[in-house]
Amino acid sequence: MNNNNNFNSNFNSNRISSTQPYLSDDARNALFEGKDRKWGNNNNNNYDTLSNQDVFEKQKRDMEEQDKMLDALSGSISRVKDTAITINKTAQEQTDMLDELDVHVDSTSARMRNTTKNLITLTQQSKTTGYCSAICFLLLVLLVIIILASVL
């Protein structure tokens, strides 16, 4: 019991006295703008002055307006869906074209490598062929000189 009294005394320590409310009437009116309820506005309910038939008609109009908004939203969603489908088709077509291009680039790269190897081989052979032809030419000249020397 002593613990409970200690809790109550700590809980009420912000009050001037335990019998006084936290806020004076003036402070409460200033805070809540003169309303007798803690939350919200007293005029929140638009149906207070309407008859049952009027409430029904108002709710029916509200529902019709909401249906129109939902129809417009549905149309917008359908257009977004159609656009997304078109984008998907275009992206798929471009992906296919890129795949085909990749295959062509790979085959062209392989042919370029082969051609480069062939050119390197040809260049090396042409260097050797030049030496062989020079040797043959010099042997021919030597042979001509030997023949001319033997004749004279």
Swiss-Prot record:
GO terms for cellular component: endosome; endosome membrane; SNARE complex. Its main location: membrane. The chain crosses the membrane at residues 132-152. It is found in: Endosome membrane. One of its GO terms (biological process) is endosome to lysosome transport. It comes from the Eukaryota. The keyword Membrane applies. Residues 1-131 are cytoplasmic. It is a single-pass membrane protein. Keywords: Coiled coil, Endosome, Membrane, Signal-anchor, Transmembrane, Transmembrane helix, Transport. Residues 1-22 are annotated as: Disordered. Residues 1-14 have a biased composition (Low complexity). The keyword Acetylation does not apply. It holds the Pfam family SNARE. Residues 60-122 form the t-SNARE coiled-coil homology domain. Involved in the targeting and/or fusion of transport vesicles to their target membrane during transport of proteins from the early endosome to the lysosome. Required for fusion of late endosomes with lysosomes and homotypic lysosomal fusion. Component of the SNARE complex composed of syn7A, syn8A, vamp7A and vti1A. Belongs to the syntaxin family. This is Syntaxin-8A. The lineage of its organism: Eukaryota, Amoebozoa, Evosea, Eumycetozoa, Dictyostelia.
